[in-house]
Amino acid sequence: MSGQTRAVLAAAIFALAIPAAAQAPAPVTAFDGKYVGVSAHIAKSTGHGRQCPRQHAPEALTITNGSVQSSGKEKWTGTVGPQGNVILRNKLSMRVDARIDPQGTITGRYQGPACMVDYVWRKQPM
């Protein structure tokens, strides 16, 4: 391979690498803020002969750059996608699949082996 061919090839590879690096996904900030827990309602008890634990309003969530955290004892963590899809997990590994609507309300459901629980959080004004 001649020196000129190598130079052209190197320039082409370099030129192709620049747009790929420039297309890294931007952080999701449209949903940033604090969301206060509104309710947790047992939607269905699926366990045979087992009682679902009594529910209380979930602890507040803070969303920053697509990352969800809570500081209470339940320790919710998760992610928010660009369309408002939310996946949450707490310290007990409970998974809640949720969505943020245009009004800033997060609604989601936990589907466990014995219970289904519907959760609601509402965004607080800045």
What is the role of each PLM region?
Residues 8, 111, 124-125:
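Small/flexible residues
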Residues 17-21:
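N-terminal signal peptide c-region/cleavage motif recognized by signal peptidases
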